[in-house]
Each structure stands twice: as structure tokens, then as C-alpha cells.
Amino acid sequence: MRMTMEEMKNEAETTSMVSMPLYAVMYPVFNELERVNLSAAQTLRAAFIKAEKENPGLTQDIIMKILEKKSVEVNFTESLLRMAADDVEEYMIERPEPEFQDLNEKARALKQILSKIPDEINDRVRFLQTIKDIASAIKELLDTVNNVFKKYQYQNRRALEHQKKEFVKYSKSFSDTLKTYFKDGKAINVFVSANRLIHQTNLILQTFKTVA
């Protein structure tokens, strides 16, 4: 049975989403290793990137196996969210124009606020303020994306428009998840949705970096 375009997009999203642990967990490890042995770190990084590309989710499987072997009990989704705020070199836009650097800054700000959710979620007053901050950060990021659209012409504008729509879709999904959370109290669903929004934020940067 042939997949619809929407199903293909969803599968592609799931595939790239499952690779989040590569840059959220392993990249900081590689960066630390570079200080000790640059060559070994670069070789290991390249090997992980290649393996993850060929087998999406492999990094997550390896990490989970290590945790299991060491009998470490950890909420992986929550931990991933806490670590996902760091800049990822592969996603950062290198163009020096203020609009592009502003895009980097606004994306960083949103990711940092989202990554604080596990620390804020059990304090209702603080969490409500965090939700307001997230809404403001989302608006600021979208405003910056629109500013770049106005000032620069792109041959591949369709790809940028598509990624912007995806970001808006996941922003709305995050909002819906929050409404449900206040009814059922299931924090894990908020963490999952926040991770997806961080992933979409990175994809916006990646798309601009690719076509800019």
C-alpha cells in the first residue's frame, strides 16, 4: 500500500525526531573528548553521524542500553528536554547579517525556556509564567522568520514556508498538550511535546542554513 504525502512527511519527522539524542546527548560528549583527544573525538563523531543516518534511532538505543546495563533509572524524555537547549553547530546559521544572527538568538531563547519546563512544571505559578514566556518566544521567532522573508529572496522559498508551517503546527500541538496537562496532570506528554517543538526550532535553523 502506498503512503500518502502526509504519511511520508510524518514518517520523515519521526525518523529525524528519533535522532535527537545524537546532538542533545552525544555532541556535548564529543566536545569534551576533543579537549583530550581531538582525532579520536572527530573519528567517533563521524562514525556516530554516519551510523545514525543509516539507522535512525541507533544513538538512542545505545544510550538506553548503557543506562540499562548500569541499572540507572532515568526519565529519558525529561533528561533529553533538559539537555536540548544547547546550540548545535550543524544547525547554527553562519551568515553574518543581523537578521540571521537574530534568528539564531530567538531560536536559542525559545529552546532555553522550553528546556526549563521540568524544573518549573510542579510550581503552578512559575509554570504559568513559563508558558507565557514560551508564547512570547514563539511569536518573536516567527516575527524574525517573517523579517528574513521580507528582506531576502529565496529560490527555495517553498521549503522555508513548509518548515514555518510545521513549526506553527507543532506550536499549536504544544498548546493543546498544555491544556490537556491541566486536566490529566501527565507531565511526560508535555516533555514529549516540548522536545518536538525544540526539534522543529532546530529544523527552521537547518532549513535557512541550507537554502541561505
Curated annotation (Swiss-Prot):
The lineage of its organism: Eukaryota, Metazoa, Chordata, Craniata, Vertebrata. Changing residue 135 to D: Loss of interaction with CCM2. There is a cross-link at residue 186 (Glycyl lysine isopeptide (Lys-Gly) (interchain with G-Cter in SUMO2)). GO terms for biological process: angiogenesis; cellular response to leukemia inhibitory factor; endothelium development; establishment of Golgi localization; Golgi reassembly; intracellular signal transduction; intrinsic apoptotic signaling pathway in response to hydrogen peroxide; negative regulation of apoptotic process. It is a peripheral membrane protein. This is Programmed cell death protein 10. The keyword Cytoplasm applies. The modification N6-acetyllysine is found at residue 179. It is found in: Cytoplasm; Golgi apparatus membrane; Cell membrane. Belongs to the PDCD10 family. It comes from Homo sapiens. One of its GO terms (cellular component) is cytosol. GO terms for molecular function: protein homodimerization activity; protein kinase binding. The gene is PDCD10. Homodimer. Interacts (via C-terminus) with CCM2. Interacts (via C-terminus) with PXN. Interacts (via N-terminus) with STK25. Interacts (via N-terminus) with STK26. Interacts (via N-terminus) with STK24. Interacts with GOLGA2. Identified in a complex with KRIT1 and CCM2. Interacts with KDR/VEGFR2. Interaction with KDR/VEGFR2 is enhanced by stimulation with VEGFA. Interacts with RIPOR1 (via C-terminus); this interaction is required for the association of RIPOR1 with either STK24 and STK26 kinases and occurs in a Rho-independent manner. Coiled coil: none annotated. It is linked to Cerebral cavernous malformations 3: A form of cerebral cavernous malformations, a congenital vascular anomaly of the central nervous system that can result in hemorrhagic stroke, seizures, recurrent headaches, and focal neurologic deficits. The lesions are characterized by grossly enlarged blood vessels consisting of a single layer of endothelium and without any intervening neural tissue, ranging in diameter from a few millimeters to several centimeters. CCM3 inheritance is autosomal dominant. The keyword GTP-binding does not apply. Keywords: Acetylation, Angiogenesis, Apoptosis, Cell membrane, Cytoplasm, Golgi apparatus, Isopeptide bond, Membrane, Ubl conjugation. Ubiquitous. Promotes cell proliferation. Modulates apoptotic pathways. Increases mitogen-activated protein kinase activity and STK26 activity. Important for cell migration, and for normal structure and assembly of the Golgi complex. Part of the striatin-interacting phosphatase and kinase (STRIPAK) complexes. STRIPAK complexes have critical roles in protein (de)phosphorylation and are regulators of multiple signaling pathways including Hippo, MAPK, nuclear receptor and cytoskeleton remodeling.
